[in-house]
Amino acid sequence: MSGQAEGSTNTEEVPRFRYTAQTAAEIEQRWQRRWEELGTFHAPNPAGSLKGEVSDEKLFVQDMFPYPSGSGLHVGHPLGFIGTDVYARFNRMLGKNVLHTMGFDSFGLPAEQYAVQTGTHPRTTTEKNIERYLTQIRRLGLGHDERRRVATTDIPFYRWTQWIFLQIFHSWYDTDADRARPISELEAQFAAGERATPDGRPWAELSRTEQRRIIDSYRLVYLSEAPVNWAPGLGTVVANEEVTADGLTERGNFPVFRRNLKQWMMRITAYADRLIDDLDRLDWPDKIKTMQRNWIGRSQGANVVFPLDGSAGSIEVFTTRPDTLFGVTYLVLAPEHPLVDELTAAQWPQDPDLRWTGGAATPAEAVAQYRRAASMKSDLDRQENKEKTGVFTGAWATNPVNGEQVPVFIADYVLMGYGTGAIMAVPGEDQRDFDFAEAFGLPVVRTVQPSEGFEGGAYSGEGPRINSANPDVGLDLNGMHLDEAKKTIIEWLESHKHGSGTVQYKLRDWLFARQRYWGEPFPVVYDSDGIPLGLPESELPVVLPEVADYSPRTFDPEDADSRPEPPLAKATEWANVELDLGDGLKNYERDTNVMPQWAGSCWYQLRYIDPDNDQAFVDPANERYWMGKRPELHGPDDPGGLDLYIGGVEHGVLHLLYSRFWHKVLYDLGHVSSEEPYRRLYNQGYIQAYAYTDSRGVYVPAEEVEERDGKFFFQGEEVRREYGKMGKSLKNSVSPDEMADAYGADTLRLYEMAMGPLDASRPWATKDVVGSHRFLQRLWRNVVDENTGELRVTDDEPAIEVLRALHKTIAGVREDYRELRFNTAVAKLIELNNLLTKEYSATGAPRAVVGPLVLMVAPLAPHMAEELWSKLGHDGSLAHGPFPEADEQYLVEDTVEYPIQFNGKVRSRIVVPASAGQDEVKAAALADEKVVAALDGREPRKVIVVPGRLVNVVG
């Protein structure tokens, strides 16, 4: 299923100077060497080792950096890379100082798993893979400033990842100031008595351990004994985001269990409001903003207190619908809720409903069995599970608005991380509650009047409140609609001390530890009291030790009771260390977890700015220049950040949310001037491909499949075609090297940009690549004589219609490049080149048109453009421009074409002078022979002229 470059098989049959794959290869290698020698894409900084003369006009454009896998790139990977390069090259030609580089997100599980299997150090594998990627990327002619390249696994890089971790560790969130502050300021407040301790004792009377416990409860990084996702088969915990809907790990498909473990957490929830509110300040796709808003899940509602019967205790519930309190018929706690053990009754009540007991002899037995089953499900699985399960705890609570007793259940569809880990169930208005009530025989009370025609079940629509009054407590919501009812019930709850209005979030704090080897070590040690201490900057970097075994201890994938044993714990000489942390030499124990793969990607754009700085993670002057706020360009609410960030929509929540969080902490602490890392975000689409399976369902090599009469065959057997991702496992992967060998890198670049809008997915078709190659050949022929190699251009004045076409193309292509519409830019360039071929094939095209055309092609096909620009007599590179500007006088049309509609159908077209008035246009339309024939001697009933657009004749 492949195409063949024109004239690339038998060089004896083609002219000597034709643009072939071989010609392209020679040109591309020559210009890539020259760019490297001249430092063509080096972007100067205002300060530091890369200091140079900087322009006020700058552009910082960045790709989401790749993980260097062992399989290398396929043609789908460079789509975004080429797109950013085209945009960067265009802006560089406009005279801007453009920072564009590429790094590698190189920590990760695949290299570690390969190390476990082969004994090869992950660094060896990673560096080999990076070199392969670089070879492929360089061949594409991407204009990167390679001085700025980083990899997250480089020790000088992760030294600063560790440093940033310590800045966050040594910070707390001041809710009054609404920003992070150094932890030392919090300690000073306690010491001065400006902030009270939890039990009211003076700070000086507390022991060191008590003081640390209080301080640590405020930190933005803290240790927590909390429910985590434990994957015994991997030997590590994983974040919620790394668990599939099936309750398995994203990598390896291992079962995941919920269990309590002590883990590092980052208090991202402190930034929930700012992370939501500042989305309005960003030039991002609405889809990504919605994804982040939904992930954070800000909900306004109320906390309601339900007293427990026979106890002084109570259950606090968060609800977004306090107006439905009269419809509460039971409560549900998350299985992990700390109150469960306390409130679980010793015995069942007399004659319990067997649906409530789970077949257990006592509530405690039922709860224990259910908790174990729930621990084997992921949060996503628990939320999406359609079969409602649960058990009665034997406890009852009182509904504060009507005094009704309601049973208390535990059920896995309630999660500990959202709200209070407890819900009030209103089966009349919530489908999950309704399904649970039906399964357990619980009553349903409606509190909202359903609309006419409602057929039963839970009613989630709007309507007046019903069944919602209790005169004994002075509360009547009946007849009210939502907003009024919510306001009234919250006021009642607050005045009667039964609850309060509040805001809750779905977002939970970020689990920030992995039991792996190949990751950033934590810059933390534990003293003899088990207190975690951040290392001083002089002790950085904490370098990964050499170990004999790279794997964490793994367990039977179903062994939910196992506990993590990280591989770094095996490096005992490294883990047990003697240090002087200011109070003499003492023995400490290093933290043996590593950071998640997300850590390096949270801040790498800042290191691109200042990659050689060994005194700071970034010089403030360089950060201000490249990422600082520019209200004069972007409006008064500009948060700053790099100018364009391109990557896949799959990173819409995790990477982007984590990176925004880290950046905001750095901003609060005064380390950066920008409030956001990415001012503008653009999601490129995907290149997809056909894959083929035989009768066994086994994938067969796509390039060996033949098409005959609309059917597909592999080695004579008919195969089934499917459309989707491109990848090695699907045997439909196409290497960019293969395409560059067959056509040249410029052809591949042009084809990928011409396939469709950059933000849309599109099918790969090798047979169509030759079309882009032929365009470049035709462009070459308009400049170079294929037989002699001589220039074909003339110094003749272009015809006026050619000048109009040229300047119309310049105006359109400039706009297309500016708006990332590269496919339409290609179409305009092809159209102009075709005009030159048509008008000047015999004589040669005018230099005044050829030169601008070559410059316009340069961002897309830079190697060929450089070669043609050189042949046109220019000494330097065109990489820094100038990009052509349109002359307005040629954009004004002398004539206007009007389509003529007769009774609603287009029957003809007329061309009139652009200066023609409506009467002249009307007369010309009525004189058109097709209109005359359609009227057949009749007078038209109406003639409507829409200036510049159409004439509508009603006969």
Curated annotation (Swiss-Prot):
Gene Ontology annotations of biological process type: leucyl-tRNA aminoacylation
InterPro entries according to UniProt: Leu-tRNA-ligase, Leu_tRNA-synth_edit, M/V/L/I-tRNA-synth_anticd-bd, Methionyl/Leucyl_tRNA_Synth, Rossmann-like_a/b/a_fold, tRNAsynth_Ia_anticodon-bd, Val/Leu/Ile-tRNA-synth_edit
Residue sites binding ATP per the record: 728
Pfam families listed in its UniProt record: Anticodon_1, tRNA-synt_1_2, tRNA-synt_1g
Top EC group: ligase
Major site of localization recorded for this protein: cytoplasm
Gene Ontology MF annotations: aminoacyl-tRNA deacylase activity; ATP binding; leucine-tRNA ligase activity
Catalysed reaction equations from the record: tRNA(Leu) + L-leucine + ATP = L-leucyl-tRNA(Leu) + AMP + diphosphate
Entry keywords, A to Z: Aminoacyl-tRNA synthetase, ATP-binding, Cytoplasm, Ligase, Nucleotide-binding, Protein biosynthesis
EC number assigned by the record: 6.1.1.4
Gene3D superfamilies: HUPs, Isoleucyl-tRNA Synthetase, Domain 1, Valyl/Leucyl/Isoleucyl-tRNA synthetase, editing domain
Motif stretch ('HIGH' region): 66-77
Annotated motif 'KMSKS' region, positions: 725-729
GO CC term, one of those recorded: cytosol
Subcellular location: Cytoplasm
Family from the record: Belongs to the class-I aminoacyl-tRNA synthetase family.
PANTHER family (alphabetical): LEUCINE--TRNA LIGASE, MITOCHONDRIAL (PTHR43740:SF2), LEUCYL-TRNA SYNTHETASE (PTHR43740)
Listed name of the protein: Leucine--tRNA ligase
Organism: Saccharopolyspora erythraea (strain ATCC 11635 / DSM 40517 / JCM 4748 / NBRC 13426 / NCIMB 8594 / NRRL 2338)
Lineage: Bacteria, Bacillati, Actinomycetota, Actinomycetes, Pseudonocardiales
